[in-house]
Amino acid sequence: MSRSEALFAQAQKHIPGGVNSPVRAFKSVGGTPLFFKHAEGAYVVDEDDKRYVDYVGSWGPMILGHGHPDVLDSVRRQLEHGLSYGAPTAMETEMADLVCSIVPSMEMVRMVSSGTEATMSAIRLARGYTGRDAIIKFEGCYHGHSDSLLVKAGSGLLTQGVPSSAGVPADFAKHTLTLPFNDIAAVEKTLAEVGQTVACIIVEPVAGNMNCVPPAPGFLEGLREQCDKHGVVLIFDEVMTGFRVSLGGAQGHYGIKPDLSTFGKIVGGGMPVGCFGGKREIMGCIAPLGPVYQAGTLSGNPLAMAAGLTTLKLISRPGFHAELTDYTSRMLDGLQQRADAAGVPFVTTQAGAMFGLYFSGADDIVTFEDVMASDAERFKRFFHLMLDGGVYLAPSAFEAGFTSIAHGDKELQITLDAAEKAFAALK
């Protein structure tokens, strides 16, 4: 029995399913989840001392690679001054100033402790600002696990094979309208009918929770136009895409300014952090300035601010994101070449330093239906074959992959060598 198998058996005694987030259980790919004990650079090391090139990156935050010395040093320095104060700190203001200088649409920002908390708070704020109740989201897009958002969600819920979650009251769900991703005509039709009741549209500008589906040409532009027309708040959920697709996030890359944005993952440098922000007029409705209440004991935690500030400063250097995107493109080109050579139907998607892998004969992946038509069973086999070759992919056919600046030519070769063997075995 491996150490991971023994630890998983032990974990199931007191942790539901043996994990603290469902996708980690390997339910969609089969087998025993790996338990990791160390991570450094582009690698993770499991409890049996096997090293893997890591394309999960803690589900996105580790854009610098694991254990970047500058980030670790900043956290160590803060440790000497205490873990949490429950009071304002200078670092919170520095973080707010930096985020607002980087992200095109941000005029004010509020720190929270997770991406779920950020999206939940942004929606509450949009409702308070507009005085409307309904929200629009898109099929297969995941915005955290708050009740009103677990309606035809993506990510872990796709992995489980269910469209929603038990325990969500019908009264919550009735205010959530779900439309097809990348279908602006559906948005136009819905807003023409009920636009006066809709507080906000929330969207992943790149859908990263049904693997990785970039926006179709004109989709984000159409959302901006329709929200302006109907007085609807446009929220970009940039928890995944923020600071990764480009320094300014997806909104910086695609040139579309939302009214509100939510962030997580990279903004905390690996610590539990989220934030939301946007137009000053809307943010002025949040307490203590306005009537929309939001609070958090650990919001703006000094350890998290130290890690996040250091990370954002490091990734702001000229050329950083061009290097990341280039590595990602070279890796995906190499995978496609090897799949084609093996005669395996395979297509990749990319948005900067995030990517999707699909076993599909489609020319491109644009819709939720395209995602669901891909061969998840073949992905299961591929996942385990890549593990055997020393490459750790997300343990789900519906999760995006992530690269880091620590990935280089050596890691690329390991990845492509493993993939060549895997594709040959999948014929």
Swiss-Prot record:
One of its GO terms (molecular function) is transaminase activity. It is found in: Cytoplasm. Keywords: Cytoplasm, Isomerase, Porphyrin biosynthesis, Pyridoxal phosphate. Its cofactor is pyridoxal 5'-phosphate. It is an enzyme of class 5 (isomerase). One of its GO terms (cellular component) is cytoplasm. Its EC number is 5.4.3.8. The modification N6-(pyridoxal phosphate)lysine is found at K265. It catalyses: (S)-4-amino-5-oxopentanoate = 5-aminolevulinate. InterPro entries: 4pyrrol_synth_GluAld_NH2Trfase, Aminotrans_3, Aminotrans_3_PPA_site, PyrdxlP-dep_Trfase, PyrdxlP-dep_Trfase_major, PyrdxlP-dep_Trfase_small. GO terms for biological process: protoporphyrinogen IX biosynthetic process. Gene3D superfamilies: Aspartate Aminotransferase, domain 1, Type I PLP-dependent aspartate aminotransferase-like (Major domain). Pathway: Porphyrin-containing compound metabolism; protoporphyrin-IX biosynthesis; 5-aminolevulinate from L-glutamyl-tRNA(Glu): step 2/2. It comes from the Bacteria. Its main location: cytoplasm. NCBIfam families: hemL (TIGR00713), PRK00062.1 (NF000818). PANTHER family: GLUTAMATE-1-SEMIALDEHYDE 2,1-AMINOMUTASE, GLUTAMATE-1-SEMIALDEHYDE 2,1-AMINOMUTASE 1, CHLOROPLASTIC-RELATED. Belongs to the class-III pyridoxal-phosphate-dependent aminotransferase family. HemL subfamily. This is Glutamate-1-semialdehyde 2,1-aminomutase. It comes from Pseudomonas putida (strain ATCC 47054 / DSM 6125 / CFBP 8728 / NCIMB 11950 / KT2440).
